Amino acid sequence: MKVLRTYYIFLFSTVVTSQEKEAIKYEDLYERNGLIYASDQDSSFNGTVDENWPTGINKLSYIYKDGKPDSKWSDWFNNGQPKEEVEYSDGIKNGLHKQWYKNGQQKFERTYKNGIHDGKWTEWYENGQS
């Protein structure tokens, strides 16, 4: 009987946790007093915003914590090539910031520490020359 009860608890918890949360679109977010909120929430937004181009290719992936950008943000061109990656911590650029041309060639790479440019700043032309 104890094994059966454990099985049902496991089954129920699996069903509950496997239900996907409704995706939040970037356009459903708004700014208030410097923080980001979802249109249906009273508290600042915590979570991920993932969107695709109509073709199904990734368009963007943003993470928010306490209404501020957090972790790595990524954008892609509609051809699937990466467009931009930015690392945030508590709403401030902290780490690498990279951008690409639509042809896939890297455009620039910069490093930030606490929102301030720190270190080497490298830029490339669309043909790959620096």
Where would I find each of the regions flagged by the language model?
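Glycine/tyrosine- and acidic-biased, solvent-exposed loop/turn segments at the edges of beta-strands
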Residues: 14-130
